Every structure is written in C-alpha cells, then in structure tokens.
Amino acid sequence: SAASDVYKRQISNLTTPHPLAKLFIETAHSIGMKKNTDYNSGDQEGSFLYQTMIKNSMRWSASDAYLKPILSKKNFKLLIKTYLHKIIFNNKKIESVIIKQGLNFKKIFINKELILCAGAINSPQILQNNGIGNQLKLKELGIECVQNIPEVGQNLKDHYAIRIAMRTKNVSTFNTESRGLSLLKEIFNYYFLKK
C-alpha cells in the first residue's frame, strides 16, 4: 500500500548508495526486472534501492510521524504494558473495553471510536476472539459472531528478505567499512557530513 502523506514527506532516497547496490539494480534490470524508483507509491514490484525515513539527519519512525504529535491531546491516552481482555458491544456497537494491567482489570467506556493497533497477528486475533470475523469459523470455535466480516485474519503475506553474503575483491562493503579506521571515517561522515 502507498505511504500516507504525513509519512511521505520524510521519505528520501539514499544520498550515497553503495556502488554494489547500484550494480545489483543494473544487473537485475539487464535480465528484465523493472527498476522501481519509489516502492512507497504502492507498486512494490521491481528492483530498488532502499528509501529512508530521515528528518534533520536523524532516523524518523512511524512513532515520530503519528504518535508523538498527538501524545498531548486531551482525547488521546497511551497505555503501555496493557492487554485488551474483552470488547463489550451494545447492538454491534463497541460500548467499552476491559483491559488488564498487571493483575488489575479496568473497564474503559468508548465515546466515539476505538483504534485497534495490535499488529498483524494480534489485531485479527483480538477481533476474532471478540466475535468479529468469519461467522462460520467463529461458530466452529464456539465464539458468538457479533459482526460477520470474513476478511478478518485473511490475506496475511510475509515479506521475504534474503541476505546474500559474499567476499569481494577491490571493493569495500558495509562489513569492511564498519571496522577499524574505516569505522572512524563512517562516524565522521555521520556526525559532521550528515551522510
């Protein structure tokens, strides 16, 4: 999927890509694989150099983009080390949730909306455990269906990354650049040249 506008503002291409990375892209292109200059546009097919999330010469995360700007809002509260125990419905509308913090349970009423961000595995698990999902599968598990949404828990795809380790002659690599005097050069480049 395409990156959001907030996130896209900080996406940048590498300023000094490694010569072997460029060669890899050219080689892939020479055997028919298309070059992809912006895999954050929604099209992830092809060979590409990694894009980075950098703001003011520092790594910029999803937390920096979305979470930190709203931490001080009155209608937002971040709970850490908290487990969502149960979602309570009133006529298919979420009324409240029961959370667990340590050994304590607490009921929180929902005014407008609940945003569930528990990851690729836990989000559908929480929904299904609370009756949101494929009605037939929920019935098999003895879970009362509150909302029949067959897509919940479906279409999870892994993104495989294969690391290739090779020795090179007459070409420095990230491994050789992270040792000895080369490491000092890289530290200098980072702190003073912002590379």
Regions found by a protein language model. Give the residues of each.
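Core beta-strand elements of the Rossmann-like FAD/NAD(P) dinucleotide-binding domain
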Residues: 103-113, 117
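Secondary-structure transition/capping motifs at alpha-helix termini
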Residues: 72-75, 91, 103-105, 132-148
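Conserved redox-cofactor binding core of oxidoreductases
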Residues: 1-94, 100, 163-187
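Flavin (primarily FAD) binding-site architecture
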Residues: 116-141
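General beta-strand structural signal in soluble alpha/beta enzymes
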Residues: 37, 79-80, 116-117, 145-148
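Mid-to-C-terminal "cap/lid" subdomains and adjacent gly/pro-rich loops that border
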Residues: 10, 134-195
